[in-house]
C-alpha cells in the first residue's frame, strides 16, 4: 500500500513523529554499522562473545561475529517497516469501529514507530559495546535493553488509556 492509501484506510494521517522515525531508525542502525566497520581492522582475530552471570568473559569468537548484531537489527527494522504498510493485518486488541478507527490506528502506528526506534537503539548499542571489547559486561547495557523492550509498550498503553 502507498502512504496515501494507508492514511485513508486508517482514517488518520502519518504524524511528524512517525515520519522522523521512518528515517531515524535506519540512520541509527547505519551509524552502528559504520562504527563497527571503522573499528573492525583494529580488532583482534578473536573477541569476547559471551559473558556469564557475573559479567566475566566465558566465551570467545571470531571478530566476524560482530556483523551479526547489526544485520539482525536491519532485518528487524525492515520487518517492522513492512508491517507498517499493511494496517489491515494488525491485531489491535480491540474492536475497530467508525468512531475509534483513527485513534486506534494512530496509536498502533506510533507503537510501530516506537518499536522501530527502540530496536535500532538497542541493536546499535549492543554492536558498539561488542566492538569496544569491554572486559566485563556493562550492567547499564542490561538496563538499556530493558528500557528499550518495555518503553514502547508502556507509552502505548498510557496513551491509549488517555485516549487523546
Annotate each PLM feature.
Residues 18-26, 79-83, 108-120:
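Select subsegments of transmembrane alpha-helices in polytopic membrane proteins
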Residues 1-14:
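Short, Lys/Arg-rich, polar N-terminal cytosolic tail immediately upstream
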Residues 36-68:
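Active-site and channel-lining beta-strand-loop segments
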Residues 56-76, 108-113:
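Interfacial helix-start motif at the membrane-water boundary
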Residues 86-110:
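Cytoplasmic juxtamembrane regions at transmembrane-helix boundaries
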Residues 16-44:
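Short, basic/aromatic recognition patches
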Residues 39, 75-95, 154-164:
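Membrane-water interface of transmembrane alpha-helices
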Residues 121-164:
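Alpha-helical transmembrane segments of multi-pass integral membrane proteins
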Amino acid at each position: 500500500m502507498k502512504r496515501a492509501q494507508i492514511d485513508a484506510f486508517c482514517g488518520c494521517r502519518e504524524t511528524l513523529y512517525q515520519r522522523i522515525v521512518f528515517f531515524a531508525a535506519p540512520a541509527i542502525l547505519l551509524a552502528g554499522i559504520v562504527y563497527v566497520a571503522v573499528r573492525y581492522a583494529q580488532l583482534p582475530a578473536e573477541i569476547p562473545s559471551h559473558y556469564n552471570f557475573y559479567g566475566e568473559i566465558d566465551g570467545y569468537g571470531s571478530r566476524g561475529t560482530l556483523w551479526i548484531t547489526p544485520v539482525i537489527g536491519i532485518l528487524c527494522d525492515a520487518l517492522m517497516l513492512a508491517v507498517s504498510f499493511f494496517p489491515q493485518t494488525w491485531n489491535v486488541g480491540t474492536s475497530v469501529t467508525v468512531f475509534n478507527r483513527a485513534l486506534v490506528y494512530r496509536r498502533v502506528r506510533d507503537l510501530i514507530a516506537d518499536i522501530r526506534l527502540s530496536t535500532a537503539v538497542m541493536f546499535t548499542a549492543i554492536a558498539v559495546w561488542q566492538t569496544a571489547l569491554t572486559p566485563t559486561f556493562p550492567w547499564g547495557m542490561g538496563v538499556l535493553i530493558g528500557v528499550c523492550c518495555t518503553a514502547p509498550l508502556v507509552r502505548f498503553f498510557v496513551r491509549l488509556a488517555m485516549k487523546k
